[in-house]
């Protein structure tokens, strides 16, 4: 995931109108007027990471899924907010090798417009999920 995101010390307004800092950390506490330290943004990531790991663990089955699948689901959840309880998460939980999973990684729109960066990210995520680099 670190190759898909850039760690920012200065808050940036994202395409949804929220200020983010570090690795896409957004919260009402993010102050757009200040620069954060490496330690602060690393701490934000550790907090956020735990939340998304817990979310992916809701659908993850270590008997039938591998680490690559977990990591790809984590990246997807980190990007969109969650994966458990979604149509994609439910499909993965039912059958992590279902070909229809490819279709869900086509979510590439931001505010109704196709986002070229998101297209590339989703391609990397789904290819990683299915073991294709």
Regions found by a protein language model. Give the residues of each.
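Short, functionally critical alpha-helical segments immediately adjacent to catalytic or ligand/cofactor-binding
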Residues: 1-6, 70-78
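Long, amphipathic alpha-helical surface segments
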Residues: 2-18, 25, 30, 36, ...
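Short, structured surface segments that line ligand/substrate-binding pockets
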Residues: 58-68, 72, 76
């Amino acid at each position: 995931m670190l190759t898909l995101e850039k760690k920012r010390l200065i808050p940036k307004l994202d395409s949804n109108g929220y200020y983010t800092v570090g690795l896409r950390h957004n919260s009402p506490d993010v102050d757009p007027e200040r620069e954060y330290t490496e330690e602060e943004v690393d701490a934000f990531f550790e907090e956020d990471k735990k939340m998304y790991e817990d979310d992916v663990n809701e659908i993850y089955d270590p008997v039938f899924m591998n680490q690559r699948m977990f990591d790809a689901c984590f990246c997807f959840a980190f990007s969109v907010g969650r994966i458990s309880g979604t149509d994609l998460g439910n499909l993965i939980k039912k059958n992590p090798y279902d070909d229809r999973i490819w279709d869900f990684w086509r979510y590439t729109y931001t505010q109704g417009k196709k986002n070229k960066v998101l297209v590339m990210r989703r391609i990397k995520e789904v290819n990683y999920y299915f073991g294709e680099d």
